[in-house]
Amino acid sequence: MMKKYLIGFIAVIFSFSGQAAREFTDQLGRKVVIDDHVERVAVLQHQTLNLLVQLDATDKIVGVMGNWREQLGQNYERLAPELVKVPNVGDLKSVNLESLVQLKPQVVFVTNYAPQEMIDKITQVGIPVVAISLQKDNSSHAKNNVNPELDNEEQAYNDGLKEGITLIGDIVNKPDNAKELIKQTFDSRDIVARRLKDIPENQRVRAYMANPDLTTYGSGKYTGLMMQHAGAMNVAAATIKGYKQVSLEQVISWNPEVIFIQDRYPGVVAEINNDPRWQVIDAVKNKRVYLMPEYAKAWGYPMPEAMAIGELWMAAKLYPQKFADIDVDADVNNWYQKFYRTQYQGGH
């Protein structure tokens, strides 16, 4: 009875809006009916928020997650200043339903691991919900898991990113922008692959991704693939699944040659360089502890700029002689001008 009521309620909304409706399948496999022309969206996932900005759909965002600055970095406000005035309506795992309804969004984007009760609360008031995972895997346990076990990580994230960008672009009526974003991402990625193809696995640089509180990424996340594509051997991949805390003794035993730290955790650089216990590690001894630029998003989920220019930056740090003829800064500026419509102003 409730299901029939909701379907009828949605039909009434579409009828009063005077719009035709389209049916989409989100990345959890859910069928979702959405207005033909979408001008008002709410976003409770930072990855989708970043994609909407690059698709030139920022003006359609009427509600946003409360901690988007923390998730995307303090400098992100420069890329999308309009977001500062957008009302907060929840976060990755919760929603302020009253605030959301007042904004009258035509669709709400959530993460694939958003609680089912959260999705139900939104859909029960007649607002369509689209879940985005940016990974595509046939195994059922991967769909709504924050630490998925993927049958084929490479294919899952490549196909998942393409599918996610295409889905979001189609929903917000930016299909051509989505196609161009996908093309640029994978065209740029091929440049790195060609230059690193002859490096044997046992000669790849040992690298470690350092996060606060001795957390790191092992296998099953895009972070590990990013390191792999850039020619690194992720020291945590063999024993760590997903995102987990490790001991300093474990890191010392791995003895990475290079340590990378995401731009949103700048304090970790000083912690590592100033702590006497870390000084026995090759990366620290040889001053190869790098704070990553904002575009090199070593997240659990893939982002197009991370694949296109982030992996290039990382590869150039690991193997500078192989990329000496490439102007990484110029490639970065070109990306920012094309997809963020501004100059890059961060560090390299």
Q: Where do the language-model regions lie?
A:
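N-terminal signal peptide c-region/cleavage motif recognized by signal peptidases
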Residues: 15-19
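Alpha-helical, coiled-coil/dimerization segments enriched in small aliphatic residues
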Residues: 69, 222-243, 247
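Proline-aspartate-enriched helix->loop->beta-strand connector
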Residues: 89-92, 96-113, 127, 247-264
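Extracytoplasmic substrate-binding proteins
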Residues: 31, 118, 123-211, 293-348
